[in-house]
């Protein structure tokens, strides 16, 4: 049969809410890649789903600047490239902890380097019917997915018991040229200092 591309035909009467990460600040060529502090969900969401199950049928993400008046503005992709992200939705019965990580083989030092620690989620108590106490979101997670809705097929959802907070781990690369004549140009990419190994042509509209 046919698969509708109109999500309201697949899962009608859905609701949504927004979650903002803490602000990210960086300098040109910085790579921001870290687990951010815990982000509590709104009191309304926590209260509504306390001891209940939330069914998540889709999500989307973006990189935005939030102005003092509360309005949003998408960040140009050539200012900050979202290489990838991982988001963890935590329930009241779960806890994320930081543990020491001992590499099992020497090849680690030839890739990302030794990972001295990692974050894991543990269940502090059982939930009715063994409903999940945490969920992870990291599908199609590159910069090209910004503002693109990730919707699940009919009758499919990620379930979580008593959702309470998010943990977000973005990896973003700062490619915004800070020269005075370019710093506020949102219409096109202006390369800054680049290594000799850069493969992009001089007229490229992207960072190489």
Residue map of PLM features:
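A long-range scaffold signal marking pre-active-site subdomains of enzyme folds
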Residues: 1-208
